[in-house]
Amino acid sequence: DKLISDAKKFSDTAVVVFSRNGGEGGDLPMDMASYTGGDAGKHYLELQSCEQEMLSMVEKNFKHVIVLVNSSNAMELGFLEDKNVDAALWIGGPGSTGCVAVGEVLCGAVNPSGRLVDTYAYDLTTAPAYYNAGNFTYTSNGEDTSEHYVEYAEGIYVGYRYYETRYVDNETGKCD
């Protein structure tokens, strides 16, 4: 309570940062049940209950709420439609230099005015690639190795390529 009280004395604006790490070598968790703070049945790229509760607490205590999405992975961002979230900015993986630029955006010195080049789905479970994800390791002589791989059964139709192709097929009637 003291921390919130002190922060409110400093500003009526709160900045909330959501981050997700991931990269080469393995897929992201499809069920967060075994992770601290994770929810059974929720995957890594959606908000967990503890994160949603934290966002709600901030919204109740501050007049303005800004959300920063610090992730190179396309998270489910439907929570940004919350009427109490005043602004959102995708900052990717900013590193030390990028954080200076984030500060310039937040104080109004720079207008980011860009557009995302990635497709962000409301529900990642609607994409076929979601069901081919897993924590797979190669085997050698019948033994598991520590080398991971990802199965791309969709070929090149992963991410934006799937959404663009699906949209065109729907619009032209090719998927019937």
Regions picked out by a protein language model, each given a short descriptive name:
Residues D1-D176:
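C-terminal non-catalytic regions of proteins with extracellular/luminal or membrane-system context
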